[in-house]
């Protein structure tokens, strides 16, 4: 996500709001990040949207950040009128906007995509190569598109990867996996990527189905470790799971600290009011 363009727009908006305030006017209408000056914005902690808001504050923008562990809490805030907008990933916004047009509206979308990848511990390059091949296989055989259509209503993965030859899976690269289990770290409060069904007992979502497909191809049982997103990377560092499949945005900082796959889905930041 190219935050500099957004930040420049916000700073310009802050100056405009200042001029308006001096003339006696005031507005809380949010149409873009340029309107964040003086606004209350709900966001999930440790996400790129949260990072972007914090950067705005550091640059002097007077935006009140309302951070929550789960994105569901952000939309609860918005529905109850406790915030002016939610700053969130487009894949999540689409879930809340479907059939809820009377409650929520998407008013702005970032121009540039924000790719998401699977995250592994630094140095686990063999497993990284295997996971890349497996994702390619899901694109090659059309399964990735099926999973996307199931959870988003359309194939939002179209064009993310182009695979014209059937990949080869080298299962000898599973040497770091123990006890025949593929352990996945994720945060089950991010629909439609990963969340629980109405009973609260079963994990469902795009990333959940993706993990199960990987387990099937690898001949492994899949086990999920549900944790908060702001602590998910610490769990990977401690070896609590083999990888993170949790709508992880690919950033230079994460690529330096971890092994990140190429994108398996692309995303954008949006503002929902």
Task: Give a label for each model feature.
Residues 17-21:
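C-terminal motif of bacterial Sec signal peptides marking the signal peptidase cleavage site
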Residues 48-63, 106, 135-175:
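Ligand-binding clefts/hinges and TM-proximal coupling segments of bilobed small-molecule sensing domains
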Residues 73-77, 83, 92-93, 210-211, ...:
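Short, hydrophobic alpha-helical packing/hinge segments within bilobed ligand-binding/sensory domains
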Residues 90, 94, 98-133, 155-165, ...:
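Periplasmic-binding protein-like
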Residues 26-71, 90-94, 125, 186-191, ...:
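Bilobed "Venus flytrap"/periplasmic-binding protein-like clamshell domains
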Residues 64-68, 89, 130, 170-171, ...:
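Extracytoplasmic small-molecule ligand-binding "clamshell" domains
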Residues 25-35, 100-112, 122, 208, ...:
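Acidic, polar ligand-binding/catalytic clefts
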Residues 23, 47, 117-159, 208-217:
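Extended ligand-binding regions for polar small-molecule ligands
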């Amino acid at each position: 996500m190219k935050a500099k363009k957004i930040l420049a727009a916000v700073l310009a908006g802050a100056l405009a709001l200042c001029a308006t305030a001096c003339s006696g006017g005031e507005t809380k209408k949010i149409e873009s990040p340029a309107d964040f000056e003086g606004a209350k914005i709900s966001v999930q902690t440790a996400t790129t949207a949260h990072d972007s808001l914090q950067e705005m504050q550091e640059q002097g923008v007077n935006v009140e950040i309302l951070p929550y562990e789960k994105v569901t809490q952000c939309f609860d805030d918005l529905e109850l009128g406790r915030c002016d907008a939610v700053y969130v990933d487009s894949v999540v916004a689409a879930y809340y906007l479907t059939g809820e047009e009377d409650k929520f509206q998407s008013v702005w979308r970032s121009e540039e995509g924000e790719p998401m990848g699977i995250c592994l511990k630094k140095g686990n390059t063999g497993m990284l190569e295997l996971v890349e091949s497996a994702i390619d296989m899901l694109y090659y055989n059309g399964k990735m598109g099926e999973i996307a259509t199931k959870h988003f209503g359309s194939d939002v993965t179209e064009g993310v990867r182009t695979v014209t030859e059937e990949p080869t899976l080298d299962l000898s690269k599973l040497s770091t996996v123990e006890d025949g289990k593929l352990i996945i770290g994720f945060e089950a409060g991010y629909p439609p990527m990963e969340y629980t069904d109405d009973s609260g007992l079963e994990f469902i979502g795009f990333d959940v189905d993706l993990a199960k497909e990987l387990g099937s191809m690898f001949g492994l049982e899949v086990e999920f470790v549900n944790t908060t997103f702001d602590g998910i990377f610490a769990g990977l560092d401690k070896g609590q799971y083999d990888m993170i499949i949790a709508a992880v945005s690919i950033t230079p900082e994460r690529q330096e600290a971890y092994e990140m796959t190429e994108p398996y889905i692309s995303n954008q930041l949006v503002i929902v009011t």
